[in-house]
């Protein structure tokens, strides 16, 4: 009888543990103090933009069936001064994913308002938009502004900020492969309730900072509107600050015409730091 009960218990434990063991998760780190884009950007002057609000510290993604669980860490405690109900207000993030690693497969253009592109060998297949605004508003903006890539934009079912973390759950049926084989780029921006023109709810970077505008860039559209990002190997070491500044380097001509656009790569892939949960 004792042997039978022990065998039953062991089998039950194994069955309960099986799904967790099958989940595939990747994690990356980012150095602190690099929330200055190409090295020159400054925060808006309004006090709601606390120091560290756009300073990415870590990113993780886990695939569980048809869903993706995402976590983003920041270098300050999140607040919701604009009462969005999401637990945060000023942050916004774009998680670009290259699922097949094939040059020429996917898109090299980013989304409207970011003013960056991707190198051909890092063309993206899917992008997750993390916003404190409701999913219906985000989906409407994507539908009207993302053009030909709108079907490759994933909007989370759930987004929540708590402490220093923003977590989200994304429904992604049919997404092929495992997270440890994918490549990633996380771009940190600021949630804009009244975006200019075709911008996808992103905040402008100007030459001089203002109450609700970043400074240190250009008043045209030749500068990358990215405050922080993953760089290097995504381990969080000091060399990644320089790598970020180089990736976001840009040149503007007269009247804000693009002379050199910021061109990005990704982290992860075959060498991604994966962990089995």
Residue ranges and their predicted role:
Residues 1-9:
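Bacterial N-terminal signal peptides that target proteins for export
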Residues 9-16:
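Hydrophobic helical h-region of N-terminal Sec-dependent signal peptides
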Residues 11, 53-57, 79-81, 152-153, ...:
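Short alpha-helical segments and helix-capping/turn motifs at coil-helix boundaries
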Residues 18-22:
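Sec/Tat signal peptide C-region and signal peptidase I cleavage site
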Residues 23-27, 99-115, 176-277:
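Acidic/polar low-complexity flexible segments
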Residues 24-39:
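Short N-terminal segments immediately surrounding and downstream of signal-peptide cleavage
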Residues 24-25, 44-132, 263-276:
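Surface-exposed, glycine/proline- and aromatic-rich loop segments on solvent-exposed faces
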Residues 128-183, 188-200:
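Short helix-loop boundary/capping segments
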